[in-house]
Each structure stands twice: as structure tokens, then as C-alpha cells.
Amino acid sequence: MGLLLLVDLDGVVYRGADPVPGVAAVLADRASRGDDVVYVTNNSMHYRADYQTRLAAMGAPVSPDTVVSSARATAAYLREHDPAIQRVLVLGAGGLERELRDEGFDVVTAAAAATRMSQEAIDGY
């Protein structure tokens, strides 16, 4: 049985738009030896497919289930721990919206609520 590598993205695999030199090759080597590589990030701005595309372009080993963002974790957590929740008001990034929709939530977005952040704006939903 191989090792599970939990690898942060921002600052470890890449810095800004630039890949960290050598990281993709090391991760590919570890995967070829039987280790599992799972990428984690607290950045909820992007959808996991966007991360997968970026990692694949760098030559890093990646598959649909090997990217876990805070958005993905939030959606999965809500679905598992409170299945009665059906409708969610999102005051956040597009990645969070898509992950919640993937889990079957009715996602409501409100520019007014996001910009004013008042109880009245939120109560309207």
C-alpha cells in the first residue's frame, strides 16, 4: 500500500500563475510508485475541473476525484450532515456555487446581499 500525499496547491504546486519547478515531476513519480496524490486548497473561487485542467497542463497526476477545495468540502459536508437543506444563499465565489449545484442544492445568489450585506437583503430570499 502506498502513501497518501495531501498536497496544497497555492504556494506548493504553483505560485500565482507559475508552477513551482520540479513539483509536477516529483508527484508524477510518486503516483507511478503507487502513492495516491490528492490536492487540497482553501480557495473556493474555482471549480474543481478548473484545478484539474491546470494541474494536467503542468504534467501533474490528476483525476476527477483528486482535487478537494473548500467549496467541494463545504458542499459535501452540507449534503451529508444536513440533508434537509435544499436552498442555499451563496455570498461567495463561482466555485462554491457550482459545487453546491453539483450536490443538488438550489443555489440563490444576490448581488445586493453580497454588496450591502444587510439583514434586509438576506431576508428577501
Kindly label every feature range from the protein language model:
Residues 1-125:
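HAD-like aspartate-dependent phosphatase fold
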